[in-house]
UniProtKB/Swiss-Prot annotation:
GO CC, one annotated term: cytoplasm
EC number: 2.7.8.7
A family per Pfam: ACPS
Subcellular location: Cytoplasm
Similarity comment: Belongs to the P-Pant transferase superfamily. AcpS family.
Reported function: Transfers the 4'-phosphopantetheine moiety from coenzyme A to a Ser of acyl-carrier-protein.
Name assigned to this protein: Holo-[acyl-carrier-protein] synthase
Protein origin, superkingdom: Bacteria
């Protein structure tokens, strides 16, 4: 196994809150998958939830070396928790096609947040 990509992102939670205040649900609709949206709608801390998901997806896009462009969209990356609560990443559409093309066999996700920031790291492994 070899490391194919590494990406890290940090998000200021207040910036996400400001965008939501200005544009309502537009950012959440653009960033979240349908499954994540369902959780976001009833989450006790929706801004923090969205900030953490945004950080993971930005980190994943960096790990793939593409950013969010050329057919890749935030909602093609879905963050979920396994049975132990560990964050995991599921891919859809162009993101899945790219992962298969690059030979990605494992994706490792770490996620942390404090009062003002959320950060994530994604490692892609063959």
């Amino acid at each position: 196994m070899a490391i194919l990509g590494l990406g890290t992102d940090i998000v200021e939670i207040a910036r996400i809150e400001a965008v939501i205040s200005r544009s309502g649900e537009r950012l959440a609709r653009r960033v979240l998958s349908d499954n994540e949206w369902d959780i976001w709608e009833t989450h006790q801390q929706p801004v923090r939830f969205l900030a953490k998901r945004f950080a993971v997806k930005e980190a994943a896009a960096k790990a793939f070396g593409t950013g969010i462009r050329n057919g890749l969209a935030f909602n093609q990356f879905e963050v979920f928790n396994d049975e132990l609560g560990k964050p995991r990443l599921r891919l859809w559409g162009e993101a899945l096609i790219l992962a298969e093309k690059l030979g990605v066999a494992h994706m490792h996700v770490t996620l942390a947040d404090e009062r003002h920031y959320a950060c994530a790291t994604v490692i892609l492994e063959s």
